[in-house]
């Protein structure tokens, strides 16, 4: 006998979900390309991309087909067995990057947890049990587990949970002298986002990343690139390290890797990977067939000249619209980022009001992000159409006008 479903509203969230999020007042129920519709049928243009996740937009036909096909074949085996989609995806990632080995997980946090554990374990077994220092950066974000949130340089996320993992040092981003001051032979790894996403869409300078590479080589430390947000085509290269010409020892990927399906990966060399053995790390769901089938389909589309080269043109269109908005309303002190990870910093008179612009955008029918209290962030689909860019930015301009009026 069928049971009538209880009506779901935004109030339901407050009744059943832990209060760790503050979601919008509307509930999206359908998406197609760069358009989203809520329960009331209102349409939005999506420049948030699920926080840089839906790299091919919503319900891309190739990803839907991959999900349906795999869903009718094999869902889950655990890592007591391997599976074909995981091996295919692993081969694609290795063939396209510096890496020789890959390990799949389910989220950016898990990929980074894996990377940090591997970096410390490698240093302990190859060098010294006292080689455990991790150097990371203020305003970084690497995840929400106790280890990853401690490596992230934001006390607002890491404080209040008791003792933190030890031997983690934070220094200013893009400050090579600060790194040199704390770098020594006890350092096992330097962990960096080539572009700090949550930290305000701040891109590393080429000199900074090259300097980190040299320091790591000098002190036999591993260079770890967290490309969870800036990887998988977001910058216009498949991974940001390719743009900089600086090769890390370990790289993490998530978000856009699955195009909306939860999956992540840690990539490294055979030499570093060999420090792990059976049982050193693991995941019940990591590399499951459903996730890897969808990620494989996403990879095949993103890693093409058509998509990657188009990102630079699309970025310029966004920047031109933001510049026009600034000329009209005088609200931005800086427009920055790389590819389709774009930050627009608010001028001092609008300091702390990024979420006001975000909410006004939603009211006007455009979904955008903030990166801290002072920066608007745009992370749209990598294949967003020009017409959607134009219309969405017109809506955002209307929203800005209402906030500053």
From Swiss-Prot:
Q: Which family does it belong to?
A: Belongs to the class-III pyridoxal-phosphate-dependent aminotransferase family. ArgD subfamily.
Example of a GO biological process term = lysine biosynthetic process via diaminopimelate
This chain's protein is named Acetylornithine/succinyldiaminopimelate aminotransferase
User: CDD domains under this entry?
Assistant: OAT_like
Which residues are modified to N6-(pyridoxal phosphate)lysine?
A: 255
Membrane-spanning residues = none
Q: Which Pfam families match?
A: Aminotran_3
| Pathway entry | Amino-acid biosynthesis; L-arginine biosynthesis; N(2)-acetyl-L-ornithine from L-glutamate: step 4/4; Amino-acid biosynthesis; L-lysine biosynthesis via DAP pathway; LL-2,6-diaminopimelate from (S)-tetrahydrodipicolinate (succinylase route): step 2/3
Name the enzyme's class: transferase
Positions of N(2)-acetyl-L-ornithine binding: 144, 283
Q: What does this protein do?
A: Involved in both the arginine and lysine biosynthetic pathways.
Q: Native species of this protein?
A: Salmonella typhimurium (strain LT2 / SGSC1412 / ATCC 700720)
On subunit structure and binding partners, the annotation says: Homodimer.
Of the GO CC terms on this record, one is: cytoplasm
Q: How is its activity regulated?
A: Inhibited by gabaculine (Gcn).
* Database matches in PROSITE patterns: AA_TRANSFER_CLASS_3
Q: How does activity depend on pH?
A: Optimum pH is 9.5. At pH 8.0, the activity is reduced by 50%.
EC number(s) per entry: 2.6.1.11, 2.6.1.17
Q: What's in the keyword line of the UniProt record? A: Amino-acid biosynthesis, Aminotransferase, Arginine biosynthesis, Cytoplasm, Lysine biosynthesis, Pyridoxal phosphate, Transferase
One MF annotation (Gene Ontology) recorded for this entry:
pyridoxal phosphate binding
Necessary cofactors: pyridoxal 5'-phosphate
């Amino acid at each position: 006998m069928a049971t009538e479903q209880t009506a779901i509203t935004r109030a339901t969230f407050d009744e059943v979900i832990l209060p760790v999020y503050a979601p919008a007042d509307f509930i999206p129920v359908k998406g197609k390309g760069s358009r989203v519709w809520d329960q009331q049928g209102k349409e939005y243009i999506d420049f948030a991309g699920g926080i840089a996740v839906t790299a091919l937009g919503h319900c891309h036909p190739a990803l839907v087909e991959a999900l349906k096909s795999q869903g009718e074949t094999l869902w889950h085996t655990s890592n007591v067995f391997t599976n074909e989609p995981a091996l295919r995806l692993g081969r694609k990632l290795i063939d396209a990057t510096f890496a020789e080995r890959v390990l799949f997980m389910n989220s950016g946090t898990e990929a980074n947890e894996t990377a940090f554990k591997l970096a410390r374990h490698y240093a302990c077994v190859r060098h010294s049990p006292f080689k455990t220092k991790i150097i990371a950066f203020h305003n970084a974000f690497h995840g929400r587990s106790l280890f990853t949130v401690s490596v992230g340089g934001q006390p607002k996320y890491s404080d209040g949970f008791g003792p933190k993992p030890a031997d983690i040092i934070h220094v200013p981003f893009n400050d090579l002298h600060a790194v040199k001051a704390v770098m020594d032979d006890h350092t096992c790894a330097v962990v960096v986002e080539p572009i700090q996403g949550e930290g305000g869409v701040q891109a590393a300078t080429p000199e900074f990343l090259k300097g980190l590479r040299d320091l790591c080589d000098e002190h036999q430390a591993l260079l770890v690139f967290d490309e969870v947000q800036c990887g998988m085509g977001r910058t216009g290269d498949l991974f940001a390290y390719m743009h900089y010409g600086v090769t890390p020892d370990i790289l993490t990927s998530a978000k856009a890797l699955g195009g909306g399906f939860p999956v992540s990966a840690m990539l490294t060399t055979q030499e570093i990977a060999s420090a792990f053995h059976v049982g050193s790390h693991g995941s019940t769901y990591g590399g499951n067939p459903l996730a890897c089938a969808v990620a494989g389909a996403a990879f095949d589309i993103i890693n093409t000249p058509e998509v990657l080269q188009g990102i630079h043109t699309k970025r310029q269109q966004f920047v031109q619209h933001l510049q026009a908005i600034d000329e009209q309303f005088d609200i931005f002190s800086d427009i920055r980022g790389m590819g389709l990870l774009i930050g627009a910093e608010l001028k001092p008179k609008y300091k702390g009001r990024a979420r006001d612009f975000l909410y006004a955008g939603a009211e006007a029918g455009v979904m955008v992000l903030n990166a801290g209290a002072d920066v608007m962030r745009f992370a749209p689909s990598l294949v967003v159409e020009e017409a959607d860019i134009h219309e969405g930015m017109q809506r955002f301009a209307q929203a800005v006008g209402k906030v500053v009026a």
